[in-house]
Regions:
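Periplasmic solute-binding protein
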Residues: 1-4, 86-90
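Ligand-binding pocket segment of bilobal, Venus flytrap-like solute-binding proteins
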Residues: 4-78
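Extracytoplasmic/secreted proteins, especially bacterial periplasmic and envelope-associated proteins
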Residues: 15-21, 25, 37, 41, ...
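Conserved C-terminal helix/tail region of periplasmic/extracytoplasmic solute-binding proteins
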Residues: 40, 148-179
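Mature extracytoplasmic/periplasmic domains
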Residues: 92-152
Length: 179
């Protein structure tokens, strides 16, 4: 959508069709659509380009470096912008022990714990006071902590109407199947 200068939140069928048509035009060059196999394939050189989550790309980069296989993995956010990515913790409405869940979340949000998690998994965390505790190589990696000018071009997904969800599903199925 952004590549076509369209609003990524649009539910307009004509705009969504334009985006789908662009994806269909490159479909012959797409090897497969998969949400997890690309990490290993990218790390071992079996795939040359993926659209994926930063954490997955970082894992592929680290695996390639550890294997010393000559594969160089890099991550890039399109200049037009991209969806923001983040993981969440949620407590089900009918949780049997919500106090324990809150205690666990509060533990994870302690600066030292959040920084230790970031240092281990190479995912940014939402705790500003943890940032100084994060290893400098991670803290300054724009793959993990995008600079402000890049972050300003990012967006979160919106909630679609059921009709728009159906249209997205139909168009995406057409893209994947090459129709």
């Amino acid at each position: 959508m952004l590549f076509r200068s369209l609003d990524p939140h649009s539910g307009d069928p004509a705009e969504l069709q334009k985006a789908a048509d662009l994806l269909k035009s490159i479909r012959p060059y797409v090897q497969n659509f998969h949400s997890s196999q690309y990490v290993g394939s990218l790390a071992n050189g079996g795939t040359c380009l993926v659209v994926g989550w930063s954490g997955d790309i970082i894992q592929a980069r680290d695996r390639a470096e550890e294997a010393s296989n000559g594969v160089h993995v890099a991550y890039s956010i399109p200049k037009e912008g991209a969806p923001q990515w983040f993981d969440m913790l949620a407590i089900p409405k009918d949780a049997k022990h919500p106090e324990a869940a809150y205690a666990f979340i509060n533990y994870l949000l302690q600066p030292k714990v959040a920084a230790a998690n970031t240092n281990f998994i190479h995912y940014a965390n939402p705790v500003p006071t943890a940032t100084p505790l994060v290893d400098e190589a991670i803290r300054t990696d724009p793959t993990i902590y995008p600079p402000a000018d890049v972050a300003a071009k990012m967006f979160t997904y919106s909630i679609n109407t059921p009709e728009t969800d159906k249209l997205y599903t139909r168009l995406w199925t057409e893209v994947k199947t090459g129709r």
